Amino acid sequence: VTEMDNIMFCAQTHNPQPLHLDEEFCKNTMYGQRIVNSLFTLGLVIGVTVGDTTLGTTLGNLGMTDVRFKNPVFHGDTIRSVTKIQEKRESKSRPDSGIVTFEHFGFNQRNEEIAYCIRTGLMMKRPA
């Protein structure tokens, strides 16, 4: 995660929070430095799994629950993700689709868990 990743995300989402942008302000916080925007972190944790899990098969995200940020992310951190399938079922309203519940875990380079969420998606089914 780069400093520019964080700055650009904050700018694009109109989030001027000093905790993400102001180095002087952050020197006096419990972190001692700027932290990466948590929604960027969550997006990254989910996004890096797409190539291995859902590329070209997602029809839409239906919701997220149990979102937690367990440790801060700092500029220069390296993030990796693990995704588990919690549940899958047929869609009641769309016979060509299924509902899949994913559990996403994000870790930094020290193997500390940095983020977690449960996400439900509307997914394409394989043709019968």
Identify the function of each model-found stretch:
Residues 69-78, 82-128:
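HotDog/MaoC-like acyl-thioester-processing domains
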